């Protein structure tokens, strides 16, 4: 069995019989996938926010709210929240900041430290590949130039 707290991994596993529930589940899967594609993290938060928007949206429509007006209101709120987040965002620049951020995202500070070290070695334009291994532990391997695994 796989143990995960990653929203996109969990969302992919949801299969429902009821056609209306299935539409909702597909919507949440799409939210999680798009979030993962764009940000690489935050899928659980995006999934919870999507569920809250759907729940409250349906409640408001059932109470007589205009669905198009509700949609416009949500879009305005999204613009305002995005603007506020961008204003309060801070660039992650130092190796220590990268290690702290990556450690929180990975849920393991030793992984965060290794990611910061890898980023320090390859720079902002470099490529970092994470692979599973049959051995225990973490290791960093630097390949300069290009590498072709097959072919």
From Swiss-Prot:
Catalyses:
ATP + H2O + a folded polypeptide = ADP + phosphate + an unfolded polypeptide
- Identify the Pfam families for this entry: Cpn60_TCP1 (PF00118)
| rRNA-binding among keywords | no
The enzyme's E.C. designation: 5.6.1.7
Record: residues binding ATP: 41-45
Q: Which UniProt keywords apply?
A: ATP-binding, Chaperone, Cytoplasm, Isomerase, Nucleotide-binding, Stress response
Highest taxon of the lineage: Bacteria
Q: Name one GO cellular component term.
A: cytoplasm
Keyword Lipoprotein annotated: no
One GO biological-process annotation of the entry reads: protein refolding
Q: Name one GO molecular function term.
A: ATP-dependent protein folding chaperone
Subunit: Forms a cylinder of 14 subunits composed of two heptameric rings stacked back-to-back. Interacts with the co-chaperonin GroES.
Q: Give the family per the record.
A: Belongs to the chaperonin (HSP60) family.
Purpose of the protein: Together with its co-chaperonin GroES, plays an essential role in assisting protein folding. The GroEL-GroES system forms a nano-cage that allows encapsulation of the non-native substrate proteins and provides a physical environment optimized to promote and accelerate protein folding.
Its recorded name reads: Chaperonin GroEL
